[in-house]
Amino acid sequence: MTLQAQLLPGTLDLLILRAVSLGPLHGYGILLRIGQISGNALLIEQGALYPGLFRLVRQGLLKASWGTSDNNRRAKFYELTAAGRKRLREETESWNRLATAIGAALGEQPEEA
């Protein structure tokens, strides 16, 4: 099951930052990397990705530059800035605290009769 339509607000930005933290990537490479690091559980649509990339560049969290892709096509590559690295660290810590709190709140579920 893919969770593409069930991402919480802000989660896409975090996933993009995480994907790019592993090295500069073009848009399609970011889509593939998110799929890879999530075990293909998270599949992001291009229509959602590119507005997120533009937003992160405007915020100074990503830097974009033109380069050549593996198939010799011109592509825009994205990489983390120092501010992006800091935001990724902060948001990852926040996400981990939230996931722990939700896990504790849900606790063990009683078996259905």
Language-model region placement:
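Accessory beta->alpha helical hairpin/"wing" motif in late/C-terminal subdomains of nucleic-acid enzymes
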Residues: 80-84
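N-terminal helix-turn-helix DNA-binding core of bacterial DNA-binding proteins
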Residues: 5-48
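Short beta-strand/turn micro-motifs at beta-sheet edges
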Residues: 2-6, 66-67
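Basic amphipathic alpha-helical segments that dock to polyanions
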Residues: 49-56
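Short, structured helix-loop boundary elements
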Residues: 46, 74-77, 92, 99
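Beta-hairpin "wing" of winged helix-turn-helix
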Residues: 57-74, 79
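A cross-family signal for key residues in well-ordered alpha-helices
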Residues: 18, 32, 51, 89, ...
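Amphipathic alpha-helical dimerization/coiled-coil segments
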Residues: 86-113
